[in-house]
Amino acid sequence: MRLLAQLLGLLMLWVPGSSGDIVMTQTPLSSPVTLGQPASISFRSSQSLVHSDGNTYLSWLQQRPGQPPRLLIYKVSNRFSGVPDRFSGSGAGTDFTLKISRVEAEDVGVYYCTQATQFP
């Protein structure tokens, strides 16, 4: 019998108030996955996330049920201390992806993508 885990992606966006605001659209919003198999979540930004200093301040966070969010990936592809190597981040400009090479039961939760290029 195949075991399924539910990974939840969450749409994270700044409510547009002017043409300069960055809108981030994450897909899929919810994704059933099979334990031991790969999974990915992608998002697209309405404009480039490359900061004026040349860095891209894009992070991925994971929130397990009943726990606060924890940082997984920062600056697109850097794993935070203690994050398993099955998690990886990639992308550039406006398109970014979080990949899990082999889903484990402890990976169930809500995943957020955040940017620090522009604030509302």
UniProtKB/Swiss-Prot annotation:
Residues 82-113 are annotated as: Framework-3. The gene is IGKV2D-24. Residues 20-120 form the Ig-like domain. Most probably, the immunoglobulin is not assembled due to incorrect folding of light chain. Immunoglobulins are composed of two identical heavy chains and two identical light chains; disulfide-linked. Keywords: Adaptive immunity, Cell membrane, Immunity, Immunoglobulin, Immunoglobulin domain, Membrane, Secreted, Signal. This is Probable non-functional immunoglobulin kappa variable 2D-24. Probable non-functional open reading frame (ORF) of V region of the variable domain of immunoglobulin light chains. Non-functional ORF generally cannot participate in the synthesis of a productive immunoglobulin chain due to altered V-(D)-J or switch recombination and/or splicing site (at mRNA level) and/or conserved amino acid change (protein level). Immunoglobulins, also known as antibodies, are membrane-bound or secreted glycoproteins produced by B lymphocytes. Residues 1-19 form the signal peptide. Pfam families: V-set. Its main location: secreted. SMART domains: IGv. InterPro entries: Ig-like_dom, Ig-like_dom_sf, Ig-like_fold, Ig_V-set, IgV_Light_Chain. One of its GO terms (biological process) is immune response. One of its GO terms (cellular component) is immunoglobulin complex. Residues 114-120 are annotated as: Complementarity-determining-3. Residues 75-81 are annotated as: Complementarity-determining-2. Residues 60-74 are annotated as: Framework-2. Residues 44-59 are annotated as: Complementarity-determining-1. Gene3D superfamilies: Immunoglobulins. SUPFAM superfamilies: Immunoglobulin. It is found in: Secreted; Cell membrane. Residues 21-43 are annotated as: Framework-1.
